[in-house]
Amino acid sequence: MAISKEDVLEYISNLSVLELSELVKEFEEKFGVSAAPVMVAGGAVAGGAVAAAEEKTEFDIVLTDGGAKKIEVIKIVRALTGLGLKEAKDAVEQTPSTLKEGVAKAEAEEAKKQLEEAGAKVELK
């Protein structure tokens, strides 16, 4: 005997709030989905405030100071960007300079870590 949609709905309607919450969590885990409400594009001004609160996913790596160990920083800049020696040297000496744009968060944080370990000052925007 097959279970109909009506049977499922009837069963769910008889669950307590706690049982329903546990059921939702199990659905999320089993099917890899989220029960978070879907945001609709556009709308009132409040929608813009919510969008600003969302976590940024792309970053620009901006070198604000080359630091004292410029040769090490230039080597790292070349490795990160693929620039030639002269271009990398100019980027390190003429700060602030944007090294990369639209970079994923993990890559941006790793680049910042490498540059700061070499003595440079970096901002992620």
From Swiss-Prot:
InterPro entries: Ribosomal_bL12, Ribosomal_bL12_C, Ribosomal_bL12_C/ClpS-like, Ribosomal_bL12_oligo, Ribosomal_bL12_oligo_N_sf. Keywords: Ribonucleoprotein, Ribosomal protein. CDD domains: Ribosomal_L7_L12. GO terms for cellular component: cytosolic large ribosomal subunit. Forms part of the ribosomal stalk which helps the ribosome interact with GTP-bound translation factors. Is thus essential for accurate translation. Homodimer. Part of the ribosomal stalk of the 50S ribosomal subunit. Forms a multimeric L10(L12)X complex, where L10 forms an elongated spine to which 2 to 4 L12 dimers bind in a sequential fashion. Binds GTP-bound translation factors. This is Large ribosomal subunit protein bL12. It comes from Campylobacter jejuni subsp. jejuni serotype O:2 (strain ATCC 700819 / NCTC 11168).
